[in-house]
Curated annotation (Swiss-Prot):
InterPro entries: PSII_PsbT, PSII_PsbT_sf. HAMAP family: PSII_PsbT (MF_00808). One of its GO terms (cellular component) is photosystem II reaction center. It comes from Nicotiana tabacum (Common tobacco). PSII is composed of 1 copy each of membrane proteins PsbA, PsbB, PsbC, PsbD, PsbE, PsbF, PsbH, PsbI, PsbJ, PsbK, PsbL, PsbM, PsbT, PsbY, PsbZ, Psb30/Ycf12, at least 3 peripheral proteins of the oxygen-evolving complex and a large number of cofactors. It forms dimeric complexes. This is Photosystem II reaction center protein T. One of its GO terms (biological process) is photosynthesis. The keyword Plastid applies. Found at the monomer-monomer interface of the photosystem II (PS II) dimer, plays a role in assembly and dimerization of PSII. PSII is a light-driven water plastoquinone oxidoreductase, using light energy to abstract electrons from H(2)O, generating a proton gradient subsequently used for ATP formation.
């Protein structure tokens, strides 16, 4: 059961880091929203 918890924490941490980096850098593709 501990392995499942640690796996979930690892995936969520990597997801948050990727999310932050992706939205911190300017998008390469021009968007119509901004």
């Amino acid at each position: 059961m501990e392995a499942l918890v640690y796996t979930f924490l690892l995936v969520s941490t990597l997801g948050i880091i990727f999310f932050a980096i992706f939205f911190r850098e300017p998008p390469k593709v021009p968007t119509k929203k901004n």
